[in-house]
Amino acid sequence: MDENENSQSPAPSHQYPKETLRKRQNSVQNSGGSESSRLSRKSFKLDYRLEEDVTKSKKGKDGRFVNPWPTWKNVSIPNVLRWLIMEKDHSSVPGSKEELDKELPVLKPYFISDPEEAGVREAGLRVTWLGHATLMVEMDELILLTDPMFSSRASPSQYMGPKRFRRPPCTISELPPIDAVLISHNHYDHLDYGSVLALNERFGSELRWFVPLGLLDWMQKCGCENVIELDWWEENCVPGHDKVTFVFTPSQHWCKRTLLDDNKVLWGSWSVLGPWNRFFFAGDTGYCPAFEEIGKRFGPFDLAAIPIGAYEPRWFMKYQHADPEDAVRIHIDVQAKRSVAIHWGTFALANEHYLEPPVKLNEALERYGLKSEDFFILKHGESRYLNTDDKAFEET
């Protein structure tokens, strides 16, 4: 039996085989003055949207978002079929839980046994990998969650679609209090319906959601009240923490959840700029010129989270998914002091061997004259602490 067959659902009471979106009747009355609003997108501190040296978001004639760089090529149905039919799958994920436990152990996060330790102070920055693109980041007196994915499948149904081969290290009920969630785009492995419902059930309007342009209505229909929807280069903050700026920055990807909604929602990365630390979350992306713009504008970053998996075959995946060498180039472009690898070791979404991404990452680092501690790998549930005073990491 697969290890996830008996795993706890992230949803409050039952599985959600389909997206039956609902809106709470009291979503406005109980919002505490923080109900979602597109007016909240107005910049309060920084505004680079009108400058000539940054790439703005762009729509095609059909009103849908497009990638504005020559590094992009549209995903076509013939190419999808060629990939699915003609290319060999080398992922080789073992069916044995014992072998998976040996190769990709899932650790119990520190905050389960010691919840009082959650929340670093002042200069500290701690990152915990919870699988795929989900990180818990503690910085500048805030606790953040990126692209929360706690369900068994990355799919509109929990009965079919890509199934995770490593369980989440914790449940949503075991998380410490989360201040904000960063969503990069609306694909099912990054925007998980059950996880959104469960987080909203637990934290309600106290939890601020930062989402791309076009996603506000979907979030509201899920009952989320405290949602900030941003375009590229727009920014906002968490109430009571206005010294930390959240900027929605570009990436090269695409969006889709249904047959007819291609690219009606924007995609992107996040730059979190605090008085002590700067954190960059790349989300899901191919390599493009945007990262050099981000590095020049907001770098250096104390920590960047950059995807390294789901990259084969390159003729098809390179436009939408960075491979380990692309990831190192992104690390350099955004001027990251350290980076953590994400988007690997959880779902088999492409054709490379499931253990290959870290190997290829270390090879790329050596070619670029970098060390493994510059761009590091975490086990599921593992944390690292970055002290910006001496730049030393401590495992937790």
Swiss-Prot record:
Residues with N-acetylmethionine modification: M1
Binding site for Zn(2+) 2: D189, H190, D284, H343
Enzyme type, top EC level: hydrolase
InterPro entries, alphabetized: Metallo-B-lactamas, NAPE-PLD, RibonucZ/Hydroxyglut_hydro
Impact noted for substituting L207F: <5% of wild-type activity
Record-listed E.C. numbers: 3.1.4.54
Binding site for deoxycholate: K256, A348
Regulation acting on activity, per entry: Activated by divalent cations. Activated by bile acids. Activated by membrane phospholipids such as phosphatidylethanolamines. Inhibited by cardiolipins.
Any single Pfam family the record assigns to this protein: Lactamase_B_2
Gene Ontology biological-process entries: host-mediated regulation of intestinal microbiota composition; N-acylethanolamine metabolic process; N-acylphosphatidylethanolamine metabolic process; negative regulation of eating behavior; phospholipid catabolic process; phospholipid metabolic process; positive regulation of brown fat cell differentiation; positive regulation of inflammatory response
Gene3D superfamilies documented for this protein: Ribonuclease Z/Hydroxyacylglutathione hydrolase-like
GO CC list: cytoplasm; early endosome; early endosome membrane; Golgi apparatus; Golgi membrane; hippocampal mossy fiber to CA3 synapse; neuron projection; neuronal cell body
Expression (tissue specificity): Widely expressed. Highest expression in brain, kidney and testis (at protein level). Expressed in adipose tissue (at protein level).
GO molecular function: bile acid binding; identical protein binding; N-acylphosphatidylethanolamine-specific phospholipase D activity; phospholipase activity; zinc ion binding
Keyword tags: Acetylation, Endosome, Golgi apparatus, Hydrolase, Lipid degradation, Lipid metabolism, Membrane, Metal-binding, Nucleus, Phospholipid degradation, Phospholipid metabolism, Zinc
Region of interest: Disordered: 1-41
Binding site for an N-acyl-1,2-diacyl-sn-glycero-3-phosphoethanolamine: Y188, H321
Effect ascribed to mutating H185N: <1% of wild-type activity
Transmembrane segments: none
Cofactor needs: Zn(2+)
Top-level taxon of the source organism: Eukaryota
Outcome when changing H380R: <5% of wild-type activity
Subunit structure comment from the entry: Homodimer. Bile acids promote the assembly of inactive monomers into an active dimer and enable catalysis.
Record family assignment: Belongs to the NAPE-PLD family.
Classification via PANTHER family: N-ACYL-PHOSPHATIDYLETHANOLAMINE-HYDROLYZING PHOSPHOLIPASE D
Protein name: N-acyl-phosphatidylethanolamine-hydrolyzing phospholipase D
Gene: Napepld
